[in-house]
Amino acid sequence: MLKLASSFTSELLRQAESGMGYQIVEATLTDNKTKRGIAFNAELLLFDEEPRSIMLSASYSTILESAKSSTGELKSLRVVPRASTMSLSASVRESAGAYGKKTGPAKDAPREETKADEVFKRFSAYQNDRRVQADGSLLPGSYATTEADAKNVKTGAEAVARYALPDPASASYRFTIRPDKDTVIQYGIVQPDYGQPGGGVEVLFAEGTQPQTVTGPDKIPDK
């Protein structure tokens, strides 16, 4: 586990997420070996051989501050595509049936545009969500869900399950997104992963959102 230097954080924030709050990455170490891992909130790297249950051992801020620095450990980081899921769970099929028959991930879906006054929600385990900018915009390549789908989620633990998040800590910070009309979006269905069923609607803001379109977060119960 490594706390990423600010240069790596900036690099990751210029690239798309793999899902809400995380990126699947390949790291090149200083000895030129490569390792796969997950970057949480573009600032904490957990390698694949490390148990994700580490994220439950303390608060996120404590884990981040106690992690070893990436300085002198990493040469480069790049976001890599998620492996495709071959079969859909019953919950995914059910959600897809109720949502325009779309069964694949948002990144593979055709681009559409938002209608006037549409509302979206983003669930995060990180109060200081780095995809949300100081001007109230959402960075390009960020994920959220529809307001309707978010109504299925009452706790942060339910968000982890429905959106198949790799960080098992409750995603109990909920941001509200009200993009301008004609903002580019892609809709999909979250695939099962990380021992979670998925099945929720995912929305990819490929070009981000405008200033003053993201508010929050409000805090929902952890479980």
Predicted regions and their residues:
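Catalytic toxin/effector domains delivered as secreted proteins or via bacterial secretion systems
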Residues: 81-223
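Motif-centric detector for short Cys/His coordination patterns
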Residues: 1-79, 83
